[in-house]
């Protein structure tokens, strides 16, 4: 093999993030075969340790899940607990306390303002009701009502009105509309 083909068949590892590829190539060229072999053994050992730690972590996570299952802790309960804890943390902050206090004061002021507006409106309506113009209008409406309605008593339910109409028809000698229809 010539030198160009050897470069294509290199067995060096791919540089990690933020590692300069040119520095890696030049560093391996300055290391002896023995040093490179030592580093390869160390690399294999570290990779094996990482694999072992990954397996241990997986076993610990499985054990954790088993303990939670036995305690009756499920994902939904964990989520609820996390949200409750997060809310508790938020409400404990000074920013939340200041905001809450400010909003409470604003609410009290708004409530007082609405109460004041309601009182003013009520007073104005009473003033209008007691004004001579309104009294004159009220009298005119009452006069119109008495002229249109006559002296009929106010109120009464539908049955009373129906009975009084039937009685009035019977005394006048006119047949009740139902009788007229039956005769046809």
Curated annotation (Swiss-Prot):
The record's listing under InterPro entries reads: TPD52 (IPR007327)
For bias kind Polar residues, which ranges apply? 162-184
The alphabetized UniProt keywords are:
Coiled coil, Phosphoprotein
Instruction: Say yes or no: keyword Ribonucleoprotein present.
Output: no
User: From which residue to which does any coiled coil extend?
Assistant: 22-74
What GO MF annotations does this protein's record show?
A: calcium ion binding; protein homodimerization activity
Which GO BP terms sit in this record? Answer: B cell differentiation
Q: How does it assemble?
A: Forms a homodimer or heterodimer with other members of the family.
Which PANTHER family does the UniProt record give? TUMOR PROTEIN D52
Tell me the protein family, please.
Answer: Belongs to the TPD52 family.
Q: This protein is called what?
A: Tumor protein D52
Organism annotation: Oryctolagus cuniculus (Rabbit)
